[in-house]
């Protein structure tokens, strides 16, 4: 019944907590942008924390991982957006590197202080990696999470493009003429939306994506999502469903795009 007090420390993601019967010892998993998930044990007050597993120690001794650097920017209405940049392995001030924007799904989810293997694969291949939590993401309050209701692809597009500009300004070695974009599920929708409504990106990878919200509604298992977010069904909000569908602007796409899908993905199915 007392006040809540944080007893763990560090910029990382903790989960899967388990406590001893008397509450004096706890175990949990933890990860951060350069540390894959491991198991930790500590006293109930957070003291004497020790890493109990070393599943990834050998692998970490073989690879070079760049840290994630936090970046924030302000969009037109004054909202602050949070993101992170991972530099390319072997980064040098005088060199030039492509930049990839990675987009999370949801849209009501979020990136954070977590290990993302894909991002490090891209970094090791010589890419800057930008990932961010635009409006619509979770973790920043109700108004932020539902700011994009009825405007999917509109407000978050501004957040992403402003973030790309901010990253290019902060990292002169990032080449504005070699930009890529990639995401899955809602991130795939957003990838499609960006390549259909802007010419900023020279290449794209869209995974488990949505191009047509009307056909998605007829095949997905999550119709309630757009019934709320688009304020009705496709036959009640036909213009909105079509206006927010990337397929409506497909003739504008010029970026070479790799399309990846999953036959048994019932949330974002084929078709």
Go through the PLM ranges and name each one.
Residues 1-82, 86-95, 107-125, 166-169:
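Peripheral, non-catalytic segments that deliver or gate enzyme domains
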Residues 102-105, 121, 131:
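Structural cue for short, hydrophobic secondary-structure segments
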Residues 124, 131-271:
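Active-site-proximal cap/loop segments of hydrolase catalytic domains
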């Amino acid at each position: 019944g007392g006040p809540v007090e944080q007893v763990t420390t560090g910029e990382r993601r903790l989960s899967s907590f388990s406590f001893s019967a008397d509450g004096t010892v706890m175990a949990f998993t933890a990860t951060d942008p350069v540390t894959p998930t491991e198991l930790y044990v500590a006293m109930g007050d957070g003291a004497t924390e020790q890493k109990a597993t070393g599943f990834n120690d050998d692998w970490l001794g073989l690879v070079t991982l760049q840290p994630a650097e936090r970046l924030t920017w302000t969009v037109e209405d004054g909202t602050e957006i949070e993101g992170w940049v991972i530099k390319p392995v072997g980064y040098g001030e005088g060199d030039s590197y492509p930049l990839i924007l990675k987009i999370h799904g949801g849209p009501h989810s979020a990136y954070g202080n977590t290990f993302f293997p894909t991002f490090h694969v891209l970094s090791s291949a010589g890419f800057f990696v930008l990932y961010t939590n635009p409006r619509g993401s979770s973790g920043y309050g109700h108004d932020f999470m539902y700011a994009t209701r009825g405007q999917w692809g509109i407000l978050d597009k501004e957040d992403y493009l402003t973030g790309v500009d901010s990253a290019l300004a902060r990292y002169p070695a990032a080449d504005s003429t070699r930009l890529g974009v990639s995401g899955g599920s809602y991130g795939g929708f957003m990838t499609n939306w960006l390549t259909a409504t802007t010419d900023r990106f020279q290449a794209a990878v869209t995974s488990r994506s949505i191009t047509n919200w009307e056909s998605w509604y007829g095949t997905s298992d999550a119709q309630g999502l757009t019934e709320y977010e688009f304020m009705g069904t496709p036959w009640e909000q036909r213009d909105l469903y079509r206006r927010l569908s990337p397929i409506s602007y497909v003739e504008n796409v010029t970026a070479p795009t790799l399309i990846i899908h999953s036959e048994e993905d019932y949330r974002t199915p084929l078709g």
